[in-house]
Regions:
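Short, charged, surface-exposed secondary-structure boundary motifs
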Residues: 38-41, 55, 98-104, 218-220
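Short acidic-hydrophobic, aromatic-tinged amphipathic segments that line or gate anion-handling sites
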Residues: 43-49, 121-125, 157
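Internal nucleotide-binding/catalytic subdomain
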Residues: 153-271
Length: 271
């Protein structure tokens, strides 16, 4: 079978490497790809956000399956475009990809369906956000740009001055572009951060092994957050007890909540 991978980063490199090991696959394309991916796939000079061109390419080259690696095209509706053309594609539709594309949506969903999450407030007015920080916030506190920001749109602020500066950076200076039109102000939580990726078919969820991500730019857990400086798997902190709690209160309830909202999720959910 022929496979097309959409993206140009380390994630897509890992997907290409894995797909190349399948005896069922005889041809791999990647758009746009990169020099490392070229070891496993034929790189195609079509941008990840050029949905019509990508779908045309898949049709013309009789691609059997397209795998979307990047968040931006998923949130933009690439799966909808491919499905409308009768093409097989792996990833959530636009109305489900909002789970990753909008932190405010995700927080509201969890609140509505009683899925455990940190206390929060959403703001689309910087003055109201500043007023909240000055009157109700407890520090340290977390500021999150609502939209996609390559994993960098989260600021942990230790005092009011840092938080005020953060609001202005995100909402007024548009440090993260339109991702900062809305902002989530969230309770700061202590503890170990563990990530779990999961396969979802709209109803059933199958989790992968856990992973522990290191987001800070500098050694010693210092500096700003990034999309990830490194990771290891499995995490020793993801115990059987933690897994049982998450399976019961987080994973399946999230899938069920999305279905109840008419946003059936098919693809990979990142917890």
């Amino acid at each position: 079978m022929k496979v097309l991978i959409v993206g140009s980063g380390g994630r897509e490199h890992a997907i290409a490497w894995s797909v190349s090991k399948s005896p069922k696959v005889n041809k791999i394309y990647c758009a746009p790809g990169n020099a490392g991916i070229a070891e496993y796939a034929e790189c195609v000079s079509i941008g990840a956000m050029e949905f019509e061109k990508l779908a045309d390419f898949a049709k013309e080259n009789q691609v059997d399956l397209t795998i979307i690696g990047m968040d931006d095209p998923l949130v933009g509706g690439i799966v909808d475009e491919f499905e409308s053309r009768g093409l097989r594609v792996f990833g959530p539709r636009k109305n489900a990809a909002i789970l990753e594309g909008s932190k405010a949506f995700s927080k509201d969903l969890m609140k509505k369906y009683n899925i455990p999450t940190a206390a929060y407030e959403n703001f689309d007015d910087p003055e109201k956000a500043l007023a909240y920080l000055r009157t109700e916030a407890r520090f340290p506190i977390v500021l999150k740009a609502d939209g996609l920001a390559l994993g960098k749109g989260v600021l942990i602020c230790k005092d009011l001055q840092e938080a005020e500066d953060g609001v202005r950076e995100i909402m007024e200076d548009k440090k993260f572009g339109n991702a900062g039109n809305t902002m989530v102000i969230e309770e700061f939580m202590t503890g170990r951060e563990v990530s779990v990726l999961s396969f979802v078919d709209g109803k059933t969820i199958k989790t992968m092994t856990s992973a522990q991500d290191h987001k800070r730019a500098l050694d010693g857990d210092q500096g700003l957050n990034t999309g990830g400086m490194g990771t290891f798997s499995p995490s020793p902190f993801y115990t059987k007890e933690v897994d049982e709690f998450c399976q019961k209160y987080l994973y399946q309830p999230t899938v069920d909540a999305m279905a109840a909202e008419g946003r059936e999720f098919k693809g990979i959910i990142f917890f």
